Regions:
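Phosphate- and other anionic-substrate recognition elements at nucleic-acid/protein interfaces
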Residues: 1-170
Length: 170
């Protein structure tokens, strides 16, 4: 779905990363919200956008669609492996319930498989410097959920992802 506003959501058990891209001026913003406030935020943005004739595309990262995204290390004990498995399962369920609630309110949701990790950060995740290079985002600091959500919104918009770090293009 093409939109005037793109909302990318990176679901998590405590706080969901929310990235918003307004195509007019390519204005990028991001925040973290708990489950219920995430639903309210999306509904409020859609309501405000519809009043002025804008379309909103909502994209949720569906990590539950990835069977091979392992978080274990060879050194992990059985207890650590069980704890990680529980946490990943809870995160997957949060994402599924988020999609279910949004669809219950008549909101069309696009599911996005996790994007390829090809960045300079730990575990090849995107860094703050890289996301500001991609989006022109002016926030001083960001956490991983915000960066992932912003990247989801940017990717869904179809805008180019060109990164210039230390005068090198990736």
């Amino acid at each position: 779905m093409r939109g005037d506003i793109y909302i990318g959501i990176d679901p998590d058990t405590h706080l969901n990363g929310i990235g918003r891209l307004d195509m007019a001026g390519r204005k990028a913003t991001a925040t973290n919200l708990p489950f219920a406030l995430t639903i309210d935020y999306v509904r409020d943005v859609i309501k405000a956008a519809h009043r002025v004739g804008q379309k909103v595309a909502v994209i949720v990262e569906c990590s539950w669609g990835e069977a091979h995204n392992w978080h274990l290390k060879l050194s992990d004990s059985k207890a650590v492996a069980a704890k990680k498995g529980y946490a990943v399962g809870a995160m997957h369920e949060t994402g599924k319930k988020l999609v279910e609630m949004l669809e219950n309110y008549g909101i069309e949701v696009q599911l996005q498989r996790p994007l390829m990790k090809c960045w300079a950060g730990a575990d090849r995740k995107i860094t703050h410097a890289e996301i500001t290079d991609v989006c022109g985002w002016d926030k001083k600091r960001s956490n991983q959920e915000e960066r992932d959500a912003m990247l989801i919104a940017w990717y869904a918009s179809g805008l180019p992802i060109n990164v210039r770090t230390n005068n090198k293009t990736k």
